[in-house]
A protein has these predicted regions:
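Polytopic alpha-helical membrane-helix bundles and their juxtamembrane interface segments
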Residues: 1-10, 18-168
Length: 168
């Protein structure tokens, strides 16, 4: 492989899974509190700005540096929404411990774990590159943390919430 196929597949994956992952915050909060639909759109747009900018940079449709910077802005916008925006405030004021725990843990994954994707982009496109196989291993390990563990946290919170609801 020339490196293009893994990159293309990676971005197809990210265009599908990153918005779903980020929108999980909206779904969690919507299940326990009254929130406005605008949060959904802000999270979706922030995620798409991030992924599409870096895709365009990776494929040369825009400057690699600009793709990196715009992608970082999209990611930071999401983080801002989760910590200081409506999502963060809704989580802080909701009365569901399991949602608050899942929100907190998954917000850390978005903050720390998703930085791996930006570091990989930087290494691959701005720092002279790296072995494509090494990058694929790093991205696959990041996917385990950022997608599978993220999902397991949601599942665990929902399971505990269901058990608690059945006891009342």
């Amino acid at each position: 492989m020339n490196g293009q196929a893994p990159t293309a597949l990676r971005y197809i994956d990210w265009l599908l899974t990153f918005p779903l992952t980020i929108l999980t915050f909206y779904v969690m909060l919507k299940s326990v509190t009254d929130i406005k639909r605008g949060m959904f759109w802000r999270l979706l747009v922030g995620t798409l700005v991030w992924v599409i900018a870096q895709l365009l940079g990776a494929y040369g449709y825009m400057s690699v540096t600009l793709g990196f910077l715009v992608g970082i802005v999209g990611w930071l916008y999401i983080i801002g929404e989760l910590y200081m925006g409506d999502a963060g405030r809704a989580n802080a004021s909701c009365n569901n411990e399991r949602v608050q725990m899942a929100f907190f843990a998954n917000r850390l994954i978005i903050t720390i774990g998703f930085s791996i994707y930006h570091i990989g982009y930087f290494i691959e496109h701005l720092a002279g590159g790296a072995n494509i196989n090494s990058l694929n291993i790093i991205y696959n390990l990041a996917d385990v943390l950022n997608k599978i563990i993220f999902g397991m946290i949601i599942y665990s919170a929902a399971l505990e919430d269901t058990k608690k609801g059945n006891q009342n």
